[in-house]
Amino acid sequence: MTTTTETWQLFAHGRVQGVGYRAACADRATSLGLGGWVRNRVDGRVEVLASGPRERLEALRVWMEAGPPAAQVSKVEVAQAAPQLFDRFDWLPTA
């Protein structure tokens, strides 16, 4: 059985900056075997671009809705993105 790789762009809204969200998100994505990146946005959101099997992307989305203990996530937006392959999961500078 072949696993199809998808790429999703996700935005976490709420109290998601200054609470360890990016580090915890990168750890979770890495533990799920996903590639991609996470970064803070100047508007207060956290943006994620992640590639991997749909079920692992869905697991990341579910985690993002709760986040680390200090986070207060109000919503997570998800959109399909152009397929991309990544070797690892990185942090990018704020954009």
UniProtKB/Swiss-Prot annotation:
| GO molecular function terms listed in the Swiss-Prot or TrEMBL record | acylphosphatase activity
Query: What residues form the catalytic site here?
Result: 22, 40
EC class of the enzyme, as a word: hydrolase
Known EC number: 3.6.1.7
Instruction: Tell me yes or no: is Hydrolase among this UniProt entry's keywords.
Output: yes
**SUPFAM superfamilies recorded for this chain?**
Acylphosphatase/BLUF domain-like (SSF54975)
The protein's UniProt keywords, in alphabetical order, are: Hydrolase
Q: Which residues form the Acylphosphatase-like domain?
A: 7-93
InterPro entries in the record = Acylphosphatase (IPR020456), Acylphosphatase-like_dom (IPR001792), Acylphosphatase-like_dom_sf (IPR036046), Acylphosphatase_CS (IPR017968)
Q: Which Pfam families match?
A: Acylphosphatase
Task: Say if the entry is tagged with keyword Hydrolase.
Answer: yes
Which reactions are catalysed by this chain? an acyl phosphate + H2O = a carboxylate + phosphate + H(+)
> Which family would the database say this protein is a member of?
Belongs to the acylphosphatase family.
Mind telling me which PANTHER family this protein's record contains? ACYLPHOSPHATASE
**NCBIfam families in the record:** PRK14430.1
Q: Under which name does UniProt file this protein?
A: Acylphosphatase
What is the source species?
A: Cupriavidus metallidurans (strain ATCC 43123 / DSM 2839 / NBRC 102507 / CH34) (Ralstonia metallidurans)
For this protein's source organism, the top of the classification is: Bacteria, Pseudomonadati, Pseudomonadota, Betaproteobacteria, Burkholderiales
